[in-house]
């Protein structure tokens, strides 16, 4: 019974990791490949992701998160196939802790870079009158819409990664004895 429950947990984790992989990859591709060229005062200007450092960092962090989730998805597929062959308890505990720490780092990084890019986009959307920066989204509308879509996908990937880190924490604590075991002794 417990083995069947574990297999279903691995499948659920695999589905969520697949979704996070797709969301993070889509966010990275959408922001990384977004460009728009407009003529402003007889000068052709091209808006790219490299114009705003926070967007470039978002593209790289989302791509790294997608790669990490893909590797973890492959691990889930392997564990789903091998299911019965469990490694020794000590290496399993170390693997669980490693996955938890990596999941936490991925969640924090994805969330932080997405929020930083969103903050930079607010300046592009509203301008900064004290610094005499104009509203850029009035000029580069399509570029700003694509970046906004990337921010939504990045935030969904961050939320999914946070859920995965909670599942990883549950997996870590499963390797330790419960309080009832200590109370019985």
Swiss-Prot record:
InterPro entries from the UniProt entry: CASP/CASPL, CASP_dom
Residues in compartment: Extracellular: 44-53, 126-146
UniProt topological domain (Cytoplasmic) ranges: 1-22, 75-104, 168-185
Coiled coil feature spans: none
Highest taxon above the source species: Eukaryota
Segments passing through the bilayer: 23-43, 54-74, 105-125, 147-167
The keyword Transmembrane helix appears for this protein: yes
Subunit composition and interactions: Homodimer and heterodimers.
Official protein name in the record: CASP-like protein 2C2
Origin organism lineage: Eukaryota, Viridiplantae, Streptophyta, Embryophyta, Tracheophyta
